[in-house]
């Protein structure tokens, strides 16, 4: 390629010299026109074309740029052959061995790069290669005829890529660059922390040939690719490990949060246990002190027991009521309210302070709708408290997620439901504001309704009880005040005078004017409660205080439907009140009478609630407990009345379940079995429960049984009015059931005979 380029340049400058010669000849001709010439070619000299002209630096640059342009245009014709430098060049020894030449074994053929591409000292070589040089050239640089000749004939084609690769000789292990062509050794060299690129190139590659540099470059490129792939694999592996660690950390954080909340709850429970234990230890210590003081000085103990001890009653025998559970419950309520005030902006301002306020239910996922268009307005949460209803909507404030939308006392709130859409609730806050709320869960809607109704019922009961108690206390105080003014002369008062004093013949008293009511309430507060706050530690005042505390315990037990505990506390309060002597002071006498009226009222409350709870119950065990409670309360007549009313209701319920039948005989038989068997069972229960008052109450029982038998025959008579006949089988079964009552001491055969006598014409 280089020779061809030089030849072109030489021809170019040769033509340039001839043109300059022609120009000189033209000038000579023009000069010699004036002179006659006989032979114009006589003095012609032939230029020496073998010698190239001398060029200055400018002309050389111009020629080089021209040659570069020509080579760039005709690249396809003058490009160098493609050589694969990634594999070692073939040697003449390997080719000769493939041709059949014998080579000495045990030696590795070496590649003489200097002989193939010229020595590196810059000396020029002959344009015509020798046979030895031609035999040592690579296949790609040899003429095709020589390759075919050395491979076994002129007619054979060139070998394929696979055969050429098998003919490539391995690298010489004795070469100074052998360790640079192996990835492992090159990686080891480059990974040295003290590696210097300039020093490495200066020491190791300063004497390398172009082929060695190309091989080193290819090896370095492959090593770089391997390193990049390895880096990618490591990055991907690290990414997966980071994702795994992140997931594990997320799970661990969730578990830690749950553990933190559990530990917080456990801490609260342990604190509550510690509080309960301390109060219990304190009460036990005080009880021991009272027991140790009793035998030493009985009179002193009796006088000291009149003081308000912390853990004993009047006699110092029973421990004080433990209110730790109430305290724990109040703490829970306070925590719930604090959370509500923190999450809802303006909740504390709208609700205000109140005692015993607590949260009943918190319901989310509610939507406020426009009443007219039914379009959603905002997402809200409902809070039902024991005395108020609060509705909170979403807010954009970062400190509070919710803001108060509606807040109203529960006594002024009404809720109405939609029959078609059971997930919608209409809230009427007072008399003017009405809102419509909807949820997606019908169970949540029913839960809110139940909580609201429960709060409404509890508030109504509390209000009614307070009004009733206040009314009774006022009436009793007015009555006591009037009787104390004129003792022993109540019977001599005329009806007109009684009416003028606020008393009617049918009732004990009536409330006076508003000023009088206020005076009575002040006297009650001063008499019962103020002395405990002062330093007046008289025995009678503290007895009054302890009895009043027992009455409060009765109210608590009644609210929890613990009738046995309520009866025990009531009997204890009555016994303590009975030990008190008649007070000398008029104010103490009024308080004593007020406490007596309170105890009578609690007795009536127990009677009413026990009767209401057991009047329609079908379980005999609960009925027995209710009757026993009334007997312990000293009301055996009321207990018997409860038992008989319950059995009458049971008979009526079972008879309604029997219903009418197409067979009158079967129907009358079932009626007889139901009624007479229940009568028999009632007599048995009466003997078990009222064995002490059997003689006094047996007449009431017999009267009830007789009345039930009469009701039976009256029912049969109504059945016969329809034209049915009384079969002998029905009479036989009725007689059998009546005879069965003789086992419990009742004989009503005469009533059956009387019935048959009156209906003899209807016998079938």
Swiss-Prot record:
Polar residues composition bias: residue spans: 289-318
Pfam families: Exo84_C, PH_EXO84, VPS51_Exo84_N
Compartment list: Cytoplasmic vesicle, Secretory vesicle
Residue ranges of coiled coil: 239-272
Keyword Membrane: no
Organism: Candida glabrata (strain ATCC 2001 / BCRC 20586 / JCM 3761 / NBRC 0622 / NRRL Y-65 / CBS 138) (Yeast)
Ranges of Low complexity composition bias in the record: 16-27
UniProt name for this protein: Exocyst complex component EXO84
Lineage: Eukaryota, Fungi, Dikarya, Ascomycota, Saccharomycotina
